[in-house]
Amino acid sequence: MKKVKVCSPGTSANLGPGYDIFGLALSKPYDTLEVEKTEKGIIISVEGEKAEEIPTNVDENTAGVVAKKMMEDFNIQSGIHIHINKGIKPGSGLGSSSASCAGVAFALNELFELNLSKLELVKYSSLGEAVAAGAPHADNVAPAIFGGFTLTTSYDPLEVLHIPVDIEVLVALPNIQVSTKTAREILPKEIPIKDMVNNVGKAAGMVYALYNNDLELFGRYMSKDCVVEPCRANLIDGYLEVKEKVKDLVYGITISGSGPAIITIPKKEHVIDIENIFKEVWNCPVYYTKVGLGCYVEEIE
């Protein structure tokens, strides 16, 4: 095997009260990564969404950091060329950096037949997230690797719970700049016990709803975060207006990750109405998509 091409999905993290725990894989948008064996070194090339803004230096690129660590740990002597086609806009709140991290880990596992488990792939993938967010975290890379709905419940040791789900979501991507680091820095360092109780209860209810195929309950609780969303809502101009306008058209709505992307669980009969509201307020791209299966191999040579 000389070359492998992998599709790596966009993801939505937090989903309201599940801050830094919940993650959801999407069928679109997605990145594609081609990883090819070379004689030596790591070369990175990028095309697609905001490619000119993505560093190709190995130590500054999220995929490069992951690849370098894996190649060191497994004493891989050959080189590689990583070509990333960005279908996920960086800084979108849809796990753009995570897609690169997860995609390259998944590709190297296939290319060099490392036989790593999905949990081990999440662990390596999360290392690249430190470049984008300042610290390793797995709430996006976990669903990118596992697919479906994931809960990252511990980091030491790393524990990820996985629930396969069949849900359709409608995602808006406003043309607004939101820094992940800024969005994390504005969060409170301490919260009242009543807010903790609310979020723990709603998060637990969302898992219950998934097991009972109750979209109405899942969406209602997804919309009830009282810790993170109130801090970030004003970073996304028009969000509170949209939330009010679509409240009877969706089961739930919240900010995807750090934003600016907005994720909804739409009532099917109102998908067009919701899209029109998104376009009226933001004039932005909209994705109507299903929960995805995670990274997969598209081609092998």
Swiss-Prot record:
GO cellular component, one term: cytoplasm
Gene Ontology BP terms: threonine biosynthetic process
Pfam name, any one: GHMP_kinases_C
InterPro entries in UniProt: GHMP_kinase_C_dom, GHMP_kinase_C_sf, GHMP_kinase_N_dom, GHMP_knse_ATP-bd_CS, Homoserine_kinase, Ribosomal_Su5_D2-typ_SF, Ribsml_uS5_D2-typ_fold_subgr
Transmembrane segments: none
Pathway: Amino-acid biosynthesis; L-threonine biosynthesis; L-threonine from L-aspartate: step 4/5
UniProt key word Ligase: no
Location relative to the cell: Cytoplasm
SUPFAM superfamilies cross-referenced by the UniProt entry: GHMP Kinase, C-terminal domain, Ribosomal protein S5 domain 2-like
Chief site of localization: cytoplasm
GO MF, one example: ATP binding
Cystine pairs: none
EC number: 2.7.1.39
Catalyzed reactions: L-homoserine + ATP = O-phospho-L-homoserine + ADP + H(+)
HAMAP family noted in UniProt: Homoser_kinase (MF_00384)
Stated role: Catalyzes the ATP-dependent phosphorylation of L-homoserine to L-homoserine phosphate.
Annotated protein name in UniProt: Homoserine kinase
Organism of derivation: Methanococcus maripaludis (strain C6 / ATCC BAA-1332)
Gene name of the encoded protein: thrB
